[in-house]
């Protein structure tokens, strides 16, 4: 399925991506750091637009390939079965000027890259072709999480 997301045009195999995430493990199940513990609940409560955006790509929002930072200000990535058709960004210039912002009311921005040499850790058995969606997120402090 073709998605036009700001400067990016991506071709995603939504079903293969969903199939992978169905058996993937959430960050809070494998890591005890504050960011990994906080992220799954924070992402689900930050914005229905963000959750729908990720779900439409076949991604389980609670299962990033990596998440790091502190619990309210974190970065990471999700992997998607797909290709980047248009919108490549040079290394080192991923900032808000070339990011896609799914919901302008929430501080959650993403970039897409298909260069395996620049990708972070890739989950075991992730199907090809691999597209990496990096993100930066700032969540409000939640006392109940």
What kind of region is each of these model predictions?
Residues 1-44:
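Long, hydrophobic N-terminal alpha-helical segment
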Residues 34, 81, 134-136:
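Residues in well-ordered beta-strands of folded domains
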Residues 64-120:
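Amphipathic protein-protein interaction modules
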Residues 106-145:
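Glycine-rich, aromatic-bearing surface loops/beta-hairpins
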């Amino acid at each position: 399925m073709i998605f036009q997301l700001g400067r990016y045009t991506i071709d995603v195999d939504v079903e293969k991506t969903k199939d992978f995430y169905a058996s993937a493990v959430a960050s809070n199940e494998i890591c005890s750091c504050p960011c990994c513990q906080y992220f799954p609940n924070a992402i689900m409560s930050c914005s229905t637009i963000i959750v729908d955006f990720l779900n439409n790509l076949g991604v389980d929002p609670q299962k990033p390939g990596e998440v790091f930072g502190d619990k309210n200000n974190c970065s990471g990535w999700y992997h998607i079965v797909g290709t980047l058709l248009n919108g490549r960004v040079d290394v080192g210039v991923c900032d808000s000027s070339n990011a896609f912002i799914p919901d302008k009311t929430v501080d959650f921005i993403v970039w897409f890259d298909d260069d395996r040499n620049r990708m972070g850790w890739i989950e075991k058995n992730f199907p090809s072709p691999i597209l990496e969606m990096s993100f930066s997120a700032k969540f409000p402090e939640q006392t109940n999480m």
